[in-house]
């Protein structure tokens, strides 16, 4: 079994890194989402092996409903909460990727363009990479497509 299979198997879910993201409502109530990283291998035909892994986030609410990335992002109000969710997802992906103990593959991250244009926010990301021991040259960032936005 490869390190990826071991990390992603449902039987191993107890060992998976999981974060909780909370969205507070005006009335003091709130919703919590358990965040988990999943990895899609990117294969090289020339190398005949995975050369990278695209990090994908999944959120699960208390009722067990699973949220795909766009649905999860829609649960966070624009502004600080959305920035916090993005930052939390990136940190979770880096921690989970490091657990694979793969020292040659790249990590592909999807980032909302609104967050990427605020470049000063990536300073903390560079620091987080340094603290995790993951070299920035092994990380690729993809700006996710926003349908219906003319300026993107």
Language-model features: locations:
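Regulatory sensory/coupling modules that transmit signals to nucleotide-handling catalytic cores
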Residues: 1-2, 138
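Active-site core of bacterial EAL-family cyclic-dinucleotide phosphodiesterase domains
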Residues: 3-74
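A generic structural micro-environment signature
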Residues: 7, 41, 45-49, 65, ...
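Conserved protein-kinase N-lobe ATP-binding Lys motif
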Residues: 61, 75-80, 111-115
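Catalytic core of bacterial c-di-GMP phosphodiesterases, primarily the EAL and HD-GYP domains
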Residues: 83-149
């Amino acid at each position: 079994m490869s390190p990826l299979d071991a990390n992603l198997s449902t039987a191993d879910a107890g060992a998976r890194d999981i974060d909780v993201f909370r969205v507070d409502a005006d009335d003091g109530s709130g919703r919590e989402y358990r965040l988990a990283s999943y990895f899609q291998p990117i294969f090289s035909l020339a190398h005949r092996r995975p050369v990278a892994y695209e990090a994908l986030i999944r959120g699960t609410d208390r009722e067990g409903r699973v949220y795909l990335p766009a649905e999860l992002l829609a649960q966070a109000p624009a502004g600080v909460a959305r920035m916090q969710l993005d930052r939390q997802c990136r940190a979770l992906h880096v921690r989970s990727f490091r657990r694979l103990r793969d020292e040659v593959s790249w990590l592909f991250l999807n980032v909302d363009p609104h967050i990427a244009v605020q470049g000063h926010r990536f300073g903390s990301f560079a620091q987080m990479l340094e603290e995790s021991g993951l070299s920035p040259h092994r990380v690729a960032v993809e700006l996710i497509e926003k349908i219906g936005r003319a300026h993107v």
